Amino acid sequence: MAKPSHSSYVLQQLNNQREWGFLCDCCIAIDDIYFQAHKAVLAACSSYFRMFFMNHQHSTAQLNLSNMKISAECFDLILQFMYLGKIMTAPSSFEQFKVAMNYLQLYNVPDCLEDIQDADCSSSKCSSSASSRQSSKMIFGVRMYEDTVARNGNEANRWCAEPSSTVNTPHHREPEEESLQLANFPEPLFDVCKKSSVSKLSTPKERVSRRFGRSFTCDSCGFGFSCEKLLDEHVLTCTNRHSYQNTTRAYHRIVDIRDGKDSNIKAELAEKDSSKTFSAQPDKYREDANQAPDDSASTTGSRKSTVEAGIAGEEKSRATETKRIIIKMEPEDIPADDMKDFNIIKVTEKDCNESTDNDELEDEPEEPFYRYYVEEDVGIKKSGRKTLKPRMSISVDERGGLENMRPPNNTSPIQEDAENASCELCGLTITEEDLSSHYLAKHIENICACGKCGQILVKGRQLQEHAQRCGEPQDLTMNGLGNADEKMDMEENPDEQSEIRDMFVEMLDDFRDNHYQINSIQKKQLFKHSACPFRCPNCGQRFETENLVVEHMSSCLDQDMFKGAIMEENERDHRRKHFCNLCGKGFYQRCHLREHYTVHTKEKQFVCQTCGKQFLRERQLRLHNDMHKGMARYVCSICDQGNFRKHDHVRHMISHLSGGETICQVCFQIFPNNEQLEQHMDVHLYTCGICGAKFNLRKDMRSHYNAKHLKRT
């Protein structure tokens, strides 16, 4: 159980560090007065500083508040309140002080002065900026407090050359002995913080009040610590070596040793202290103040012998420390044994840059739903591996056509091996009929379709070379789809072939956007149709595998209803007045065509004015600027965590789900079961006003209306 004084102790140490300037990473200027502070403390107490540090992460070393209606006196008291939870002196005007706190958007603004004013402002337990002029000894943010002892006016301090402040304890005791005279000790000892001796207290309350009086000092760098554990952790990484190390290491513990009743006890204690290692027990660091000697001073000869014994013991301890090397290891987050059932996919820098095109599509009005599913790859010779993957939508510039489902080459399908084909991207050798599914499932982000002929090409140089010779006669048959008779019919009718290919491409596009791909095992069902998760977008027929639905969609082109949709697609092409001279894709506005050219040229013409990073698309730049400003587009309603991309927000929301719960991918509403989610999804569908048919995308509903209900003249 944590001690009740821990929070007060941490605040005290932070305030001491602020006064000393130790680890301060921010400077606040008000007129000609400068205040040092820690960003973490300011951001934890003030919403104003939190947002400022988020928006100006690279230029917050110094902050000027002179143009604000905040006086230096008020800000000094605000810093006291941030670091201590109270103020040491009353402000001249509490209303002005409260206005300044509200302006800085402090999370806790007091209603009255009595709530934050210290009951005993003269107490030295909590020092402030106003009391920083006290001559107490403080090393790197740790203030050394000592017992209140009766001294003569000219008596030297036991630890420091300057007098230090004391801690007021409930019960004052008369000292039982005089302090050790330091006249014969070297002068460098006065500059090093020594381990203060702690008296054995009778009550726990006294131990709490005396807690600030104990410190542990590093022999190498002189840093002071409040407990032995912090000192042990610091020693493992301490690399500082000062010139006074060899001359003072044997002294810093001997100073706290009082003269024993006999010289043998004193020499024994000195030798024991000098041979301590940093892994010793805590009781070896403590000295009993009640072990006071009867004599106030010892002879110079006995002191010298003690020092020599201490130096000899220290050399042995240094040799022991050199041989004993402690390496602190952190446990790995994901052990290798736990990862054996997961597919680990290495994403290159090129893939990350190209995948940003897909990430930005979530801002489009007709955005497809992101489907999260459990995929289980079950092979004959290998065990099943389960991975959770989001089904990403296809880029807008890739919607001009979809795969003819074969790697691009100059040979005709007749000359190729009818049984096997190799993937152009990963080199995997698979059958021709499975090649289409392989490209859809594995490489959808690295392929692009020609807008004129529909041939699938790998992004990059192949796409540009093909676009230059796309007007030349070439074999345009679709590989792996339909039978040989269907291919012959398509070759005899090139115009109909082009129309059918375009609509087939659009259907595959919508198929990827609008349907779930989930595990076929019954216990992992996410929706009631998970046994046959693949559905033809034209006739609604469901299939168990992706290969079956792709083959069915090629034969589904012959239906009259689908031909009507082809006519509707041709009729709306006349509205696209701006066409790309490389791939032939049409756009409604010239600015969209200009942005589309970056797909071919790979020219990143949109530059961030803050950091200089370049982007292909303007919406990528807008999203990047939002990250600079700290403006999260999606905020979790449970824990208030912000995300900039929708699919990242969905992944985060999934972490809040309990067993059996599911989440709507559109409005992020959580439902206890899949049946309620199915009923809720009707709210997000587009309904035909005439026949009541429902569609996921608005353009699908419009196509349905034009093909079914619009009277043609």
UniProtKB/Swiss-Prot annotation:
Disruption phenotype: Thymus of embryos show a small number of T-cell progenitors that are unable to progress through thymic differentiation. Adult mice show vestigial thymus and lymph nodes and a reduced spleen size. In the periphery and in the spleen, display an absence of mature T-cells, a reduced number of NK cells, but a normal number of mature B-cells.
Domain BTB: 24-91
Tissue: Expressed strongly in thymus and spleen, less in lymph nodes and peripheral blood mononuclear cells (PBMCs) and weakly in bone marrow. Strongly expressed in immature, but weakly in mature bone marrow-lymphocyte B.
GO molecular function: DNA binding; K63-linked polyubiquitin modification-dependent protein binding; protein heterodimerization activity; protein homodimerization activity; zinc ion binding
Location(s) in or outside the cell: Nucleus; Nucleus, Nucleoplasm
Residues modified to Phosphoserine: 355
Protein name: Zinc finger and BTB domain-containing protein 1
Gene name of the encoded protein: Zbtb1
